[in-house]
Amino acid sequence: MEQISDTLLLIAGVIGLAFVYVVLVLRTRNQVQPEAATVPPNAIIVDGSNVMHWGGDPSLQVLTGVINRITDLDLTPIVVFDSSVGYRLMGRYLHGNAMATLIGLPAAHIYVVHKGVVADEVILDLAQDNGLKVVSNDRFR
């Protein structure tokens, strides 16, 4: 009798685990996926690492001045930085949220590329894919 009781408990446990698994799978399948971020129609890309060097040493003042002028023209700046931007400005890595705070833009409008990624390629792809203009001193080829 004890062996039957142990077997029933084992079966009940397996059924319980299977039930939990099915519920989790169904719950995951029914979740609504967020829509991909869209680029605003009035967007313009700013080569942040390039612009902050206008006039010599890296400067947030120069960059924010350019960004303010862009927003005064009712354009939405999308700023792309090299991964080394934080080291150049603050001596340490800065992610997109930190850069957004420093320059006063929404984090969704800032992109710090990963180490080893060429920011210019990201800028050109973004511009070409979305028909956007770029603010930079670089000669993209």
Segments predicted by a language model, with ranges:
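Noncatalytic, typically N-terminal accessory segments of nucleic acid-processing enzymes
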Residues: 1-135, 140-141
